[in-house]
Regions:
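An N-terminally biased module of ancient metal coordination in phosphate/nucleic-acid-related enzymes
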Residues: 27, 162-261, 270-271
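Active-site nucleotide-donor binding segment shared across nucleotidyl transfer reactions
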Residues: 9-51
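Helix-hairpin-helix
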Residues: 1, 26, 114
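Active-site gating/metal-coordination segments in enzymes
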Residues: 263-284
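Acidic, metal-coordinating catalytic segment for phosphate/diphosphate chemistry
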Residues: 50-176
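Non-cysteine beta-strand/loop elements that form the S-adenosyl-L-methionine
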Residues: 86, 210-215, 275-282
């Protein structure tokens, strides 16, 4: 996700800057913020779609492209990432965005439930079987509302009960950056970090954190700056003294402990038990 997201955002900006574009958004697995994404899905609304697809095909990041059409265009970036651009008239943008945001499982369940209610859902609109009429919506909120659901955030659309929750008003609120109360993995100058305990704690406090775990590398991770067991005992005492000074944040004594080839950890059990937080990590030998 961290590699493909900048590509998607750059192309979305390019679409939005074109005079023929009314709206453009990232869709697909990128919009759902899945850990891995195989390609980029972009959707846009335009009354002159051919001008828009022809322009995006010539973007500086694009190495190859299919034939631009009024429906969209397929692209490949210089780094080999596939891009699928879909275009619809502005009145159908909500339908297109909902459909191509996925997931496939979420959409399949949504369609199945809609059919049971006499409706057919696609990127082209919602067709009422009784009247034969197809309704178009400019926003996803309207799409879900027409089907009897609260709006479902893209990150929740994985067919894990979100439709039932959206129907009965019990969808969870997504975690946001302001909800993060602390950091549980950071290094200091004791191993390969660049800040002291005091500097790291001050930075964490400035972010509004309530706690910070110091988890320097352990004794045998193989990258230098090893921390011996004796030195880690001293570090525990240093952190206790720091907390006693009332620094406005709680610092936890921890370690990123190497998993040894035979499966054990490279600190004795009594030392591990004295820590507030232990991260077990594979570094070499596997």
């Amino acid at each position: 996700l961290d590699e493909i997201l900048p590509v998607a955002e750059a192309l979305t900006r390019a679409l939005r800057e074109h005079p023929a574009c009314e709206r453009a958004e990232v869709a697909g697995s990128i919009r759902r913020r899945t850990d891995t994404c195989k390609d980029v899905d972009l959707v846009a609304a335009s009354d002159d779609p051919l001008a828009l697809t022809a322009a995006i095909a010539e973007h500086r990041t694009i190495a190859e492209h299919g034939t631009p059409s009024e429906l969209g265009v397929k692209l490949t970036t210089h780094s080999g990432i596939g891009v699928d651009v879909r275009i619809v008239p502005p009145p159908a943008f909500g339908n297109l965005l909902q459909h191509f945001s996925g997931s496939a499982a979420h959409n399949a369940e949504l369609r199945e439930r809609a059919v049971a209610a006499g409706l057919h859902v696609s990127e082209h609109g919602i067709k009422d079987d009784a009247t034969g009429e197809t309704e178009l919506f400019t926003t996803e909120e309207e799409v879900y509302r027409r089907l009897g659901y609260d709006y479902i955030e893209p990150e929740l659309r994985e067919d894990r009960g979100e439709l039932d929750a959206a129907r009965d008003g019990s969808l969870p609120r997504l975690v946001e950056l302001d909800d993060v109360r602390g950091e549980l993995h950071c290094h200091t100058t004791l191993s390969d970090g660049t800040g002291t305990i005091e500097e790291m704690a001050a930075a964490a406090r400035d972010r509004g954190y309530e706690y910070l775990a110091i988890t320097d590398h352990s004794a045998s991770h193989g990258f230098g700056d090893n921390v011996s067991a004796e030195r880690l005992w001293q570090r525990i005492e240093e952190i206790e003294a720091f907390n006693a000074s009332d620094p406005g944040i709680r610092v936890l004594a921890g370690s990123e402990v190497n998993i040894l080839p035979e499966g054990g950890l490279d600190y004795p059990d009594d030392l591990l038990a004295a820590l507030d937080w232990v991260i077990a990590s594979i570094h070499t030998s596997f």
